[in-house]
Amino acid sequence: MEALVYTFLLVGTLGIIFFAIFFRDPPKVPSKGVPSKGKK
């Protein structure tokens, strides 16, 4: 039962970190009339 909770917390933390990095504005790519893939 404890393993399920620890696994859920681990996956949730990694998911939040991945979400923050993936949807972060790319600092090295200036937008010059080109629509970025990450933003809607």
Curated annotation (Swiss-Prot):
Transmembrane segments: 3-23
Membrane-topology annotation of the record: Single-pass membrane protein
Gene designation: psbT
InterPro entries for the chain: PSII_PsbT, PSII_PsbT_sf
Keyword entries, A-Z: Chloroplast, Membrane, Photosynthesis, Photosystem II, Plastid, Thylakoid, Transmembrane, Transmembrane helix
Listed name of the protein: Photosystem II reaction center protein T
Known partners and oligomeric status: PSII is composed of 1 copy each of membrane proteins PsbA, PsbB, PsbC, PsbD, PsbE, PsbF, PsbH, PsbI, PsbJ, PsbK, PsbL, PsbM, PsbT, PsbY, PsbZ, Psb30/Ycf12, at least 3 peripheral proteins of the oxygen-evolving complex and a large number of cofactors. It forms dimeric complexes.
Function: Found at the monomer-monomer interface of the photosystem II (PS II) dimer, plays a role in assembly and dimerization of PSII. PSII is a light-driven water plastoquinone oxidoreductase, using light energy to abstract electrons from H(2)O, generating a proton gradient subsequently used for ATP formation.
The UniProt record lists the keyword Plastid: yes
Pfam hit, one: PsbT
Coiled-coil portions: none
GO biological process, one term: photosynthesis
Keyword Transmembrane part of the UniProt annotation: yes
Subcellular location(s) per record: Plastid, Chloroplast thylakoid membrane
Predominant place of localization: plastid
Family classification: Belongs to the PsbT family.
GO CC annotation terms, alphabetical: chloroplast thylakoid membrane; photosystem II reaction center
